[in-house]
Amino acid sequence: MTKIAFTGGGTVGHVSVNLSLIPTALSQGYEALYIGSKNGIEREMIESQLPEIKYYPISSGKLRRYISLENAKDVFKVLKGILDARKVLKKEKPDLLFSKGGFVSVPVVIAAKSLNIPTIIHESDLTPGLANKIALKFAKKIYTTFEETLNYLPKEKADFIGATIREDLKNGNAHNGYQLTGFNENKKVLLVMGGSLGSKKLNSIIRENLDALLQQYQVIHLTGKGLKDAQVKKSGYIQYEFVKEDLTDLLAITDTVISRAGSNAIYEFLTLRIPMLLVPLGLDQSRGDQIDNANHFADKGYAKTIDEEQLTAQILLQELNEMEQERTRIINNMKSYEQSYTKEALFDKMIKDALN
């Protein structure tokens, strides 16, 4: 029986693709295990949503693009992570490693290479991340969500496969969503998602605009961990720090979304044909990958986008109103999108690429 080791973590985006693939792997008769960090969000997500999967925690550092004394310390963490991962891989003897990226994945990919275990990497963003750039040197193949990403990668190693969406995404129950929120079925619902880490600026502007927003929408506000404001209580407004199992039910009642521009999230909104106003992480907080993702979706006519540096209460309301006027056009553009690979076909390709 073919055994696949999965790795990736640090943010929800580096875990959600694996969460969508592992159930398909199990249903097709593959064995699966997960290697991640000791305290990262991937451990919480995998152990809560896939308790049947063995989770192996390893030491991991952080990949920084700036000079810091912490970089020296993290060299030793990465080296220990390689040793930790080698120990796991020698014990489990997987046939291949599937890496979703994030800083925890690098020592695992290096360890796999040292044991002659073939690695397939997945890159969700339009431009490759630092972890995947490093890991690619030790990998057999890299799969991309955006076709344009192939321009940044060696032709002999890169293949475009499109987005990988979790199976339960379309199974959200609107009735459950309305019961969960207590919302009125006859009024539009706006979902605000600031990413797994949240956005203090976006949260502040939403709360500042709440009275105006509530005239047109009921608002579900995913604030990010530790950013919920218990003092803000209004009819038609509900806050969560983070939603796991109930997210599909909330998406089932969502008419419009304001969101960061992580690739996995925006492809889920695209699949569900939910018009989106994207506020990507700025260059002061990231390498600009979300800006590229957002601009690509805007160019395709799937979304509107606002730079966080330009985000004000007035601009937010203005862009939302314009998007509502273009709602039909945006949804029609979304209907032209087609998924490139089924998960079953993707696993067939993965096995062929890794083991041949």
UniProtKB/Swiss-Prot annotation:
InterPro entries attached here?
GlcNAc_MurG, Glyco_trans_28_C, GlycoTrans_28_N
Q: Please name the GO terms of the biological process aspect recorded for this protein, alphabetically.
A: carbohydrate metabolic process; cell division; cell wall organization; lipid glycosylation; peptidoglycan biosynthetic process; regulation of cell shape
Residues at which UDP-N-acetyl-alpha-D-glucosamine binds = R166, S196, Q290
Q: Where in the cell is it found?
A: Cell membrane
| MF terms (GO), sorted A to Z | undecaprenyldiphospho-muramoylpentapeptide beta-N-acetylglucosaminyltransferase activity
| GO CC entries | plasma membrane
Q: Quote the SUPFAM superfamilies the UniProt record gives.
A: UDP-Glycosyltransferase/glycogen phosphorylase
- EC top class, as a word: transferase
Question: Per its UniProt record, what Pfam families does this chain match?
Answer: Glyco_tran_28_C, Glyco_transf_28
Task: Give the Enzyme Commission number.
Answer: 2.4.1.227
Reaction catalysis annotation: Mur2Ac(oyl-L-Ala-gamma-D-Glu-L-Lys-D-Ala-D-Ala)-di-trans,octa-cis-undecaprenyl diphosphate + UDP-N-acetyl-alpha-D-glucosamine = beta-D-GlcNAc-(1->4)-Mur2Ac(oyl-L-Ala-gamma-D-Glu-L-Lys-D-Ala-D-Ala)-di-trans,octa-cis-undecaprenyl diphosphate + UDP + H(+)
Could you list this entry's UniProt keywords, alphabetically sorted: Cell cycle, Cell division, Cell membrane, Cell shape, Cell wall biogenesis/degradation, Glycosyltransferase, Membrane, Peptidoglycan synthesis, Transferase
**What is the membrane topology here?**
Peripheral membrane protein
The record's Gene3D superfamilies line, in alphabetical order, gives: Glycogen Phosphorylase B
Pathway it acts in?
Cell wall biogenesis; peptidoglycan biosynthesis
Q: What does this protein do?
A: Cell wall formation. Catalyzes the transfer of a GlcNAc subunit on undecaprenyl-pyrophosphoryl-MurNAc-pentapeptide (lipid intermediate I) to form undecaprenyl-pyrophosphoryl-MurNAc-(pentapeptide)GlcNAc (lipid intermediate II).
Family, similarity comment:
Belongs to the glycosyltransferase 28 family. MurG subfamily.
UniProt name for this protein: UDP-N-acetylglucosamine--N-acetylmuramyl-(pentapeptide) pyrophosphoryl-undecaprenol N-acetylglucosamine transferase
The top of its lineage is: Bacteria, Bacillati, Bacillota, Bacilli, Bacillales
> Which gene is annotated as encoding this protein in its UniProt record?
murG
